[in-house]
Amino acid sequence: TGVDVQDNRFEVVTWAVGRGEEMWCIDYSVIYANPADERDWSLLDAYRKTIFQHESGQAMKIEAMAVDTGGHFTHQAYNYCRQRERERVFAVRGDPQPSKMVKSKATVQDVNWGGKIIKKGVRLWYVGTDTAKDLIYGRLCVEKPGAGYVHFSKDLPHEFYTQLTAEARVPQRVAGGEAYRWIKAPGARNEVLDCTVYAVFCTHMLG
């Protein structure tokens, strides 16, 4: 499960991953809240307890959650994740450097918003967003069910697909030549894509 934190809501996308990293979108939810109020973060706890039902009847629970900490509510996100690391709730931040691994070594963030040292600070994981997006968009091109194929529910709104495909890989001039970067279309929203990137990170954490 990937979580993107916005000013007035949590955007959440849950994926199931099978053999060969075949993927199924299980749920897309928008949870309206005030992320500045740490009490509202309990809404994510309620969501994490959701039990989804496989078509075979088997119950499926959320195995891991990655929460974006790069927005306006960094320390609230740190605090939430720090208290739940043993429950596989990961504090993450995107790293757009090319060729950056989806999962890199974590750094410990042990200073709170007031500059005070926190005992047992939160581990912050940097996610190679360009690499993850390469992987996601590559899978969207797989046409037959099986390894790498992506399944979607018929109940997903049009906005879901618009956000998932809101970025394009375009050439940009850099020192020494040209490089490709993932760029969001002007005025577009990409929360679903960000959540999916963080969900892919979770699969790497779970091995």
Describe the function of each predicted region.
Residues 1-6:
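Two-metal-ion RNase H-like nuclease active-site motif
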Residues 21-175:
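Mg2+-dependent endonuclease catalytic cores in nucleic-acid-processing enzymes, primarily RNase H-like
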Residues 15-17:
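Beta-propeller blade repeat segments, especially FG-GAP/WD-type strand-to-loop junctions
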Residues 155-207:
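Long, compositionally biased intrinsically disordered regions
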Residues 11-13:
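Structural motif
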